[in-house]
Amino acid sequence: MKYRTHKCNELSLDHVGEHVRLSGWVHRYRNHGGVVFIDLRDRFGITQIVCRQEENPELHQLMDQVRSEWVLCVEGLVCARLEGMENPNLVTGSIEVEVSSLEVLSRAQNLPFSISDEHINVNEELRLTYRYLDMRRGDILDRLMCRHKVMLACRQYLDEQGFTEVVTPILGKSTPEGARDYLVPSRIYPGNFYALPQSPQLFKQILMVGGLDRYFQIATCFRDEDLRADRQPEFTQIDMEMSFGGPEDLFPVVEELVTRLFAVKGIELKAPFLRMTYQEAKDSYGTDKPDLRFGLRLKNCCEYARKFTFSIFLDQLAHGGTVKGFCVPGGADMSRKQLDIYTDFVKRYGSMGLVWIKKQDGGVSSNVAKFASEDVFQEMFEAFEAKDQDILLLIAAPEAVANQALDHLRRLIAKERQLYDSTQYNFVWITDFPLFAKEEGELCPEHHPFTAPLDEDISLLDSDPFAVRSSSYDLVLNGYEIASGSQRIHNPDLQNKIFALLKLSQESVKEKFGFFIDALSFGTPPHLGIALGLDRIMMVLTGAETIREVIAFPKTQKAGDLMMSAPSEILPIQLKELGLKL
């Protein structure tokens, strides 16, 4: 049986007089007395079909029984709609199909939510439980189609650049990479476990040892971590690695790749992208993921804070803290109530409060006005280049607390005051991250233990490891990290030294990374790589609020699959076969 001669978006006035066959879902149904109208929908569009009782009573009776989301196959004659009855909102709005035969291919039970009315808000848990129905509402399928085109563009470009797509193993060895592993018990080796990959990191580096030169993969990765709006337990990244190069070789490749991906949506980007060191980003924006669509740059105010008699300023400065903030143009219109709300907001991030200083009619209005002279306030206005009716917002706190609080406050105010264009795309490379972070007083990798230190900082590894910068880089878009990578360590002695600084014993290194150290010992080319978060890129490209909206079958924020009721218990016999007990 031939189910269709045309898709539901293809018919026009050029087809008037033709007999056609269409298949699809009942999108909307209307019975106007002796005339039944049905909007028939497939993935491509909608066509109106019609049956008149006086012309075909039996068919009219059958169509009168049809309900929403039934699947039909219809045959009929393409006719022009009557003048004034055209629908300009449909590609096929100038025609309709007068049905001569109809077959019900599948019936649908009562729907848990409306498919035809996309504007009705539906509880997300209900949508995820019936994901297949949610897909029919339009946005999800559109995003999946966009994702498909983005992946095609990715493969085509990287192939042009000499990258080879290689699929690396899903079942691998558990190695410390930051987050918890998802573990898979082995039936063949009782008591032993595979780990699902948090990334193909070691495999892609070993491919460079093997001489592949340039590798890529659209890889599925797994991390058992707490979820946020932009995280999933399983996610997809565009994974890349290349030999005999440095960041100056990689950056143009990635910039052109991103440009091609955005071109899928008709968005034109300008390269090269801005670059900023980690320290510059922290100093000016309070974060290593700055949103550069708006100003509100942070400024260190310690020089002026020392001239205050305000105890909170002086106490923070005496104990190594900082005083910093930003200027909001025209912000002097903020009410005391609004400023109290902002004060409560920054307290969530550990700040003791919020200092505000308004420049109004050449004078000063501030909640710390009595703690400094007029001259000090004027010096601060000059430093911030504040104009009349601007406001300065300051925080006195330890550096990390001040940065975090001001970063969030800056974003909140920019959103509330509409200081940026949501269709603007501001990319920035963040470079020169610290090689190590501090966790409970101990060294831990800022990115991962395979990141190379900058050559000029290697001498500091023994004397001042926290001062060592890494040859690593993140690509940030509008406050989202969409890619992260680094130059890799290709010297086994240096790699062992990094492991030792991380207090991994020789036995532990041999057990977890022995195969990798062996590989590095057989002639390893200098190499580097990067991974782009495909889900996050799609989230930005399609305007989705969460990455769940750009994944066909996402997990909830509690890592559950509501449609399949996973995770679920398994049978005792399955546990026994695996040699496990609960």
Swiss-Prot record:
Belongs to the class-II aminoacyl-tRNA synthetase family. Type 1 subfamily. Residues 201-204 are annotated as: Aspartate. This is Aspartate--tRNA(Asp/Asn) ligase. The record marks H32, G84 as: Important for tRNA non-discrimination. GO terms for biological process: aspartyl-tRNA aminoacylation. It holds the Pfam family tRNA_anti-codon. It is found in: Cytoplasm. The keyword ATP-binding applies. It catalyses: tRNA(Asx) + L-aspartate + ATP = L-aspartyl-tRNA(Asx) + AMP + diphosphate. L-aspartate binds at E177, R223, H447, R488. It comes from the Bacteria. One of its GO terms (molecular function) is nucleic acid binding. ATP binds at R223, D224, E225, Q232, E481, G533, L534, D535, R536.
